[in-house]
Amino acid sequence: NTGAKAPRKHLANKAARKTAAPANAGIKKPHRYRPGTVALREIRKYQKSTDLLIRKLPFQRLVREIASEYKNDLRFQSSAVLALQEAAEAYMIGLFEDTNLCAIHGKRVTIMP
């Protein structure tokens, strides 16, 4: 007995695994941002912008639909619809700001309807 240990089988298996080519060799995974990164980037983008975020024609249809409940065949100046849209978006932005403050106060991140 020389005292030398017999080679272990799992070492041979490990070496064989290293030399074998992986199934997806040469295929690079597409780049993905971590969860929340894109959301934060969008928040910064929309906070900087001053343009209207709701499309004009769908908003105009909504205004006409609501107005038709009170009186049919009403006509609107384009500036009147624009003023309504500015007011509606300003109200919604304020509402979301307050909602976010409430979520932070409640130690929450997500807001839900």
Curated annotation (Swiss-Prot):
Residues 1-31 are annotated as: Disordered. Its main location: nucleus. GO terms for molecular function: DNA binding; protein heterodimerization activity; structural constituent of chromatin. SMART domains: H3. Residues 1-17 have a biased composition (Basic residues). Keywords: Chromosome, DNA-binding, Nucleosome core, Nucleus. One of its GO terms (cellular component) is nucleus. The nucleosome is a histone octamer containing two molecules each of H2A, H2B, H3 and H4 assembled in one H3-H4 heterotetramer and two H2A-H2B heterodimers. The octamer wraps approximately 147 bp of DNA. Core component of nucleosome. Nucleosomes wrap and compact DNA into chromatin, limiting DNA accessibility to the cellular machineries which require DNA as a template. Histones thereby play a central role in transcription regulation, DNA repair, DNA replication and chromosomal stability. DNA accessibility is regulated via a complex set of post-translational modifications of histones, also called histone code, and nucleosome remodeling. Belongs to the histone H3 family. This is Histone H3-8. It comes from Stylonychia lemnae (Ciliate). The gene is H3-8.
